[in-house]
């Protein structure tokens, strides 16, 4: 019997050692999927390589088609490939990488055109309203529309569908909560400009409560009743309802009467311990958009030639009382995960776009860094949870381009000193107006978790709706 026992013990030990070796190899390969820093000295052969080795096994191991209990969608508004690259160069260096944005293992590109309202033909440069409606509803629409198709017909949003399925829902943005990206999840209006009752009566009369419509974006936000809603836009809640049971009362008073928890600074946000349909959380941390992370000079004509390279500075207006996007994301996840049915959460870094419009490199770069930190929070939760799909993408591409440091560009330029100590010039040149414009270049979309493979290759922005809905197994 002793030899047999020895053989069995040896076989078990061999299996354990083999299992450990496979686990170690898988772990190392998994690390190779997330750590994308250059591996050595950039001047040496292979020094700029980002791959540690073959990643086939690790990619196979990352694939899963099980139902996702939770979905977290993170949007960089205006975050095209140029914006990602510029921010990475500045903050991490040419051989560095973002530990959130660059750490998702499965990556693709998607198209994001909208439709012309009259001809129904493609409009190759979308706005944030049409693009957010595309992933929120799976339907193409015209620029400016929120939650409606090209004919103005209401379309159910993913947040509404997830809520009806019993999931917790969250909506987080650094913009006004009435702005296009957050508004597309919770409202159905023919124009994105209809923030409150006053604008709606003037610009979206058919949507106004007094005309039998659903009401303004802010009124619909309250009625949709996500469990967690965080961002800016407090001033619109001061408007008075013009019709219905709340006529003559402010929307802030209406929120209180409907049981919302209202918080306005970082300490109050952290003190919240519960958010659900009985006590939904409404965090409003600015009258308008929330303050950006970094400040610096705007680009100007031949600014890279006439002015010295700059280093971005912290924005003194963003005090400790203002929660960061990462802090809002982390808190939203902590509150939403208590729902046994899971949750759907959208997070937007809004001012990449707004600072790109303003030709402000430091503002734009700082907001991209902010989004990356939020992505890191989402990924940390998803890795620990094992049942969460995380997707990172943008709504449209934008104006900024990286050009030669001393280029004589026809547009507006500014030179910055990157983490490498090297000069980098950003150029903005697609508009003679005060505001730079969007562009129609396809966008990066990356994912981690169950059903992440569905972002690989070329997809369309509307595919994102079906990918997220089907991953959660809801209809």
From Swiss-Prot:
Where is the stretch described as Disordered? 419-439
Keyword Iron-sulfur attached: no
Q: Which reaction does it catalyse?
A: a phosphate monoester + H2O = an alcohol + phosphate
Disulfide pattern? 194-204, 312-362
Cofactor binding remark: Binds 1 Mg(2+) ion.
Question: What EC number(s) are associated with this protein in UniProt?
Answer: 3.1.3.1
| Residues annotated as transmembrane | none
Q: Which UniProt keywords apply?
A: Disulfide bond, Hydrolase, Magnesium, Metal-binding, Periplasm, Phosphoprotein, Signal, Zinc
Record-level Gene Ontology MF annotations: alkaline phosphatase activity; metal ion binding
**Xref: InterPro entries:** Alkaline_phosphatase, Alkaline_phosphatase_AS, Alkaline_phosphatase_core_sf
Where's the active site on this chain?
Answer: 128 (phosphoserine intermediate)
Give residues annotated as binding Zn(2+) 1.
Answer: 353, 357, 438
**PROSITE patterns from the UniProt entry:** ALKALINE_PHOSPHATASE
The prosthetic group or cofactor this protein requires is: Mg(2+); Zn(2+)
User: Taxonomically, which superkingdom?
Assistant: Bacteria
Residues in the signal sequence: 1-23
User: Which residues of the sequence carry a binding annotation for Zn(2+) 2?
Assistant: 77, 395-396
Residues annotated to bind Mg(2+) = 77, 179, 181, 346
Q: What GO cellular-component annotations does this UniProt entry give?
A: periplasmic space
Compartments, as annotated in UniProt: Periplasm
| Keyword hit for Ribosomal protein | no
What is annotated about its quaternary structure and interactions? Homodimer.
- Protein family membership: Belongs to the alkaline phosphatase family.
| Protein's UniProt name | Alkaline phosphatase
Record organism: Serratia marcescens
Organism taxonomic ancestry: Bacteria, Pseudomonadati, Pseudomonadota, Gammaproteobacteria, Enterobacterales
